[in-house]
Curated annotation (Swiss-Prot):
PANTHER family: DNA MISMATCH REPAIR PROTEIN MLH, PMS, MUTL (PTHR10073), DNA MISMATCH REPAIR PROTEIN MLH1 (PTHR10073:SF12). It comes from Streptococcus agalactiae serotype Ia (strain ATCC 27591 / A909 / CDC SS700). PROSITE patterns: DNA_MISMATCH_REPAIR_1 (PS00058). It comes from the Bacteria. This is DNA mismatch repair protein MutL.
Length: 657
């Protein structure tokens, strides 16, 4: 008897389910994607016990005939591709025909579907992949799929499920991503009878962002767009002042499909340059329209990994789209909001709430650049759980707390902003410059700086030898003197480093530099990089280099320490990129040679520093991404002293401090 046998269909489906159905959120993803492919405009997701007990997806799509409903439970039966050539021009979200049979093989599944309104429909009941019941029923147009007792026949998989709160967080994250990918579809998510998420389905992406991340977040998103012969990019990214501690808020879409791609994520950060603090990430929703021939989605069972042709060109297109859009905005952070961030840290724990978007209650007016709402249509805010700055472990508590507390806040609530103070304190550490990983992150942001329009400032005072005070047409400005000079010196060194033609000064007494044998050998291999920045070291004896001339931008008294610093930097950097090395060197030198805190400046020096800052391409952030200055407007001052009162009915002031 042959040792090799053909597996039964049920067993094969259960094996496939191990790849396709990792957790309840995987079921939600596959079924909702099928509903979207069916042309649905309204999709309702109902779950109980975070999907382990029940998942029900109801849509108003085109539905299925009785014959198609039966075939849908067979492996590799699909209506989305018919030939080999179709595999290379896929525009649907699903195409393999694996999801439904895989899910049915590990659950009790009920399908109720009809192709026309008021006509006869089909009811199918399957258990463990076997159809146990089929009958004709009356059903509205569309499909309702009920999945119960998930993993009932694969108990080993249940052992690896996390808490109900964690599984719910994964479901909400999937629904949020799909809502952003398809703002033209109205999504409703209900857990244990409570409405968790609701989008309007108007097709306005910014409105979908407001429904998912909150109105205050949507107001701080800016639109981007760019295109070439192969790609068309559109979407929204957050202002540099609105960031998160991880990449979970970056949503990349290709032809309506949510994907994960490290290089494209990196291109988003490159578009911000040094405007982002190190360790902080923007909120971004970027939709990429591409010829299906240039994207291969048949890579991974979840279809979230996509191979893209001309990926480098796409990265450049995304970076330039973001940098061009940021040029149009005033990037000086509002000081009053910064104060609110630190004063509300204890309030900043609950997961963000949002409005239930009931068309046409909330809409975005592009001409006025603001949201407007009809008071009669505002419902109570609903809890909206997203994986906000949390690992899987910490999400559990936040979701649990939010479920227990419910959503009882009124629409005129002031939303607490998220705190970035911890990241700022980290930047001040001098140990920071010794970290190769941190340096690499910095350089990725500093490759391109954009010119800016800087306000005219009139200096009038200094506090604690650290902060400069100035006034202008925009109100009061407070400047961090160390960050300001660091920015000035960075741009100076960034420009001067590498200008080797006719810019070398002979040393009357050459310098000798000794290194360990291993460092000496490494430096010899990378000597061309030092020469590119104007440092010409020659071997001179055992493990020793001699320097006979130095670049004129480096003062002679700084040569010895400066060259050692450059060599240390070169030894720290494994990549042999001249561009990156010059940027790293400029960061290091600007930080070490800038005035520190508790250093008193006279009026002339302070005014000169502000004049130099105004000439910078990016005067708003130091090379590490920290803000150089903050602004109190006249209105902010009047609010603090209660000279004017907030308009409690104004939607524009919602969430403002």
């Amino acid at each position: 008897m042959s040792k090799i046998i053909e597996l039964p269909d049920i067993l094969a489906n259960q094996i496939a389910a191990g790849e396709v159905v990792e957790r309840p959120s995987s079921v939600v993803k596959e079924l909702v994607e099928n509903a979207i492919d069916a042309g649905s405009s309204q999709i309702t997701i109902e779950v109980e016990e975070s999907g382990l007990k029940k998942i029900q997806i109801t849509d108003n799509g085109e539905g299925m005939t009785s014959e198609d409903a039966v075939l849908s439970l067979r492996r590799h039966a699909t209506s989305k591709i018919k030939s080999q050539s179709d595999l290379f021009r896929i525009r649907t979200l699903g195409f393999r025909g694996e999801a439904l049979p895989s899910i049915a093989s590990i659950s009790l599944m009920t399908i109720k579907t009809a192709t026309e309104q008021g006509k006869q429909g089909t009811l199918l009941v399957a258990k463990g992949g076997n159809i146990e019941k089929q009958e004709v029923v009356s059903s509205p147009r569309g499909t309702k799929i009920l999945v119960e007792n998930l993993f009932f026949n694969t108990p080993a998989r249940l052992k690896y499920m996390k808490s109900l709160q964690s599984e719910l967080a994964h479901i909400i994250d999937i629904v949020n991503r799909l809502s952003l990918a398809h703002p033209e579809v109205a999504f409703t998510l209900i857990n244990d009878g409570k409405e968790m998420t609701k989008t309007s389905g108007t097709g306005d992406l910014r409105q979908a962002i407001a429904g998912i991340y909150g109105l205050n977040t949507a107001k701080k998103m800016i639109e981007i767009s760019n295109a070439d012969l192969d790609f068309e990019i559109s979407g929204y990214v957050s202002l540099p002042e609105l960031t998160r501690a991880n990449r979970n808020y970056i949503t990349l879409l290709i032809n309506g499909r949510y994907i994960k791609n490290f290089l494209l994520n990196r291109s988003i950060l490159d578009g911000y340059g040094s405007k982002l603090m190190v360790g902080r990430f923007p909120i971004a929703v970027i939709d990429i329209q591409i010829d299906p021939y240039l994207a291969d989605v048949n890579v991974h069972p979840t279809k979230q990994e996509v191979r893209i042709s001309k990926e480098r060109e796409l990265m450049s297109l995304i970076s330039s789209a973001i940098s061009e859009s940021l040029k149009q905005y005033d990037l000086i952070p509002d000081a009053l909001e910064n104060l609110a961030k630190t004063s509300t840290r204890s309030v900043d724990k609950p997961i963000q709430t949002s409005f239930s978007l009931k068309q046409p209650g909330l809409y975005y007016d592009r001409t006025k650049n603001d949201f407007f709402i009809d008071a009669d249509t505002v419902s109570e805010p609903i809890a909206n759980f997203t994986n906000l700055d949390k690992s899987d472990g910490s999400v559990d508590n936040d979701v649990k707390n939010s479920v227990n507390q419910g959503a009882t806040q009124s629409p005129n609530i002031k939303y607490a902003s998220r705190d970035q103070a911890d990241s700022e304190n980290f930047i001040h550490s001098q140990d920071y410059l010794s970290s190769k990983q941190s340096l690499n992150k910095l350089v990725e942001k500093l490759d391109s700086e954009e010119s800016s329009t800087f306000p005219e400032l009139e200096f009038f005072g200094q506090m604690h030898g650290t902060y400069l005070f100035a006034q202008g047409n925009g109100g009061l400005y407070i400047i961090d003197q160390h960050a300001a000079q660091e920015r000035v010196k960075y741009e100076y060194y960034r420009e001067k480093i590498g200008e080797v033609d006719n810019s070398l000064q002979q040393l009357l007494v050459p310098f000798l530099f000794e290194f360990s044998s291993s460092d000496f050998l490494q430096l010899q291999e990378k000597m061309s990089l030092l020469q590119d920045v104007g440092i010409f070291l020659e071997p001179y004896g055992n493990n020793t280099f001699i320097l006979r001339e130095h670049p004129i931008w480096m003062k002679e008294e700084e040569v010895e320490s400066g060259v050692y610093e450059m060599c240390d930097m070169l030894l720290l950097t494994n990549e042999v990129s001249v561009k990156k090395y010059r940027a790293e060197l400029a960061i290091m030198m600007s930080c070490k040679r800038s005035i520190k805190a508790n250093h008193t400046l006279d009026d002339y020096s302070a005014r000169h520093l502000l004049d130099q800052l105004a000439q910078c391409k990016n005067p708003y952030n130091c090379p590490h991404g920290r803000p150089v200055l903050v602004n109190f407007t006249k209105a902010d001052m009047e609010k603090m002293f209660k000279r004017i009162q907030e308009n409690h009915t104004s939607l524009r002031d919602l969430g403002k401090y």
